[in-house]
Amino acid sequence: MAAHDKDDPLLPAPHTHAPASPGRRAFMAFAGVSAGATLLATGRAAVAAESMFPFSSAPGGQPPAQPGHPFASDPIWGPGGEATGIIRRLAHIKPEMFSHADFHVTSYGARTLPASALISSTAWPSGKIPWVTGGTEQTAHPTNDLQSPGSNVMVPCDYTGTQYDSCAAFNAAIMDANRAGGGRVVVPAGNWYCGGPIVLLSHVNFHLESGCTIYFSPNPADYAKNGPYRTANGNLYHTRWQANDCLNFGSPIYAFHQTNIAVTADDNTCVLNGQAMTPIQPSTQAPTSCWWTFKGSSNEYGCAGSSTPSQAYLNPNNVALTSLPASQILNPQANVSFTNQYGTTTTLMDLLTGTGWNEDQNYLPALSELRVPVEDRVFGNGHYLRPCMIEFIGCTNVLLQHYHTQNTPFWQHHPTDCTNVVIDGVFADSVGPNNDGFDPDACNYVLVQNVQFNTGDDCIAMKSGKYLDTGYGPMQNIVVQDCTMQSGHGGLTIGSELSAGVQNVYARNLTMQNENWASNPLNIALRFKTNMNRGGFIKNVWINGVTLPNGVNLAGKYGGGALGAAISKITGTGTTGLATNPSTGQGGLIAFDCDYSPSGDAVRWTPSVISNINITNVNASNVSGAVSYSMPSGFVAGSNSCFQALVMQGSEAVDYNGPLPVPTVSPISGVTISNCNLGSPVCTGAAPTTPSTSASAAPGPIFVSNVSGIALSNVVIAGTTYNTTLTASAT
């Protein structure tokens, strides 16, 4: 068990995380299935698209309240609407909430870097960097072509602990500001180096002045030196990795159980560079790996397969699950035998100790599923779970404003169990593996506005814990408005880790520009994803106004598929053609996937519930021209907006591998899509009369499986207007 340093001045006593029981989670998942029926009948889709956003530039995005305005009676965006209430609640989250006292980091010994410290990625002193200077990595991930200028400048870890390492000065200024009752810690223009986490404390605004760039150490060991948990793997921090709690490397910017905290900047010339593409090794050594190597993708960022340590390959430092002390395994079902629907007698432990249990990316979820206490889920040195760039846990009144993130190790922003969060005017610009832009996790009351996204994964992804780590409750009450998306997997995504549920989501005026459409396109515009491991629910979602001038990815891809079952599906409505490869992974404009990569999870015991989803005014244009990525066999990109327009894959009972009886697997229901023009998909085949796996049976523009009563109203696809209801059984 890790020892917590109670005298550490940077952090309070540890938070005791008590994951919700499966019974509690099931109750939360099913308690509100029918909620929102009244709102569904309000006829909001009739609001004209051109009048949707007349007030988007108003302070806080608040609408005018004049009588007779088209939004005056709108239950979502009107003066008394649900989304408007969230915006007004968060109006006080701004720089003015902090004391006017300034604490200049130069007064604490911070020094700007000499010009010689900044090295071009093509001029590493001890030799070429394989993933930057050429080869398959550069072809597959042309990072320097996709990110903004400056992303290919590196500062080696040689500067950690030198006179140019400003980490101690930054944290000393933060501590002084906190002790003084609050204030603004100011980092002036210039290039700075930080050899470890910046730990924010209550009532402190960490502020970057115009022209400021902070280069964070690329060496993982520098994030396991000063945390409050003393372990054999370093001095670690309470973190959350892919929605499972653990002790791990600290994030470059971190806070735990603080109130009134902020990271702000004068403008987007202020850069927080996580240096995830910079070699871990000092400049005197040949470069062999970086933070992004830890992803474990062969032939990318220096990963040569299983011989390269990463999250995706066997880690000998992981103790066998069957050898864990009995006192750590708190799940009473761990070794209870049961017979599953396939007639196999097994146990939870048997499922968890199958192939791949000793990979870090599987070991942490296994510890969670065994209910091992968080203080015994120890990673850090000797392990390969990358930290988020900015991670705040259990904080209240959080402001993120106007800076620019680059080269982040993992997710760019990860507020967890936070209340009252505003992210405004940030440029989330990092295209490495798992570089999601903004991932609020089990937060309550969140406003995302005026944010630009250029990411290596989902631009926005809403989370609420994975499997048993649901003690923080659902992700709820979030407004997303006036944002721009470029590259990424999903523009606006809910999931996949949503075991405690996601509810009350309001989004409007999103421009999914997708300017890199020919080389690194946005894969999906609106993405809802979960599976029988995540379970959870998605309900009460209102999306109004999404523009896609360059469509999305024109190549279809599925993200796994139902285990042991064909994924081909037709419906009796004639609106969908055969899809042997429905585009839930990429290529679908609007994609629901309740069967997301099931083979990646050893335990699949909880179906998901989706209800009351309202999508209107989504408009996608076609693009014409060559693409640099591969199209599926037999398909050629012409003048198209996507591969398939609408893909809805419900949960599949065949995936369930828990004790009998098999639980009820509800279809996706309560979804209304209206007043949309989804352009011309690559797939426009007519529905075949019988299921077929023939290559000549082209998929249609719509794919549905295990859905009920999906209402399409004035939805135009390839010139055809759909006013119909879609219902289809499971595969």
Report each predicted region and the residues it spans.
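Extracellular "leader-to-stem" segments immediately downstream of a signal peptide or signal-anchor
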Residues: A2-T16, G23-P197, L201-N205, E209-I393, ...
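Residue-level signal for WD-repeat beta-propeller blades
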Residues: S21, R179, L200, L208, ...
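Outer-membrane beta-barrel domain signature
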Residues: T160, R377-F379, D436-G437, D469-T470, ...
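Short, T/G/N/S-enriched strand-turn elements that build extracellular solenoid repeat scaffolds
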Residues: I174-D176, Y193-L201, W411-D417, N450, ...
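Short glycine/acidic-rich loop motifs that flank beta-strands on beta-rich extracellular proteins
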Residues: C194-P197, S217-N219, Q275-P279, T408-P415, ...
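Right-handed parallel beta-helix
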Residues: S210-G211, T259-C270, T396-Q406, T419-S430, ...
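Active-site beta-loop-alpha junctions enriched in small/polar residues
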Residues: G465, G495-E497, N531, D595
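Gly/Ser/Thr/Ala-enriched C-terminal appendages of enzymes
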Residues: N533-Y722
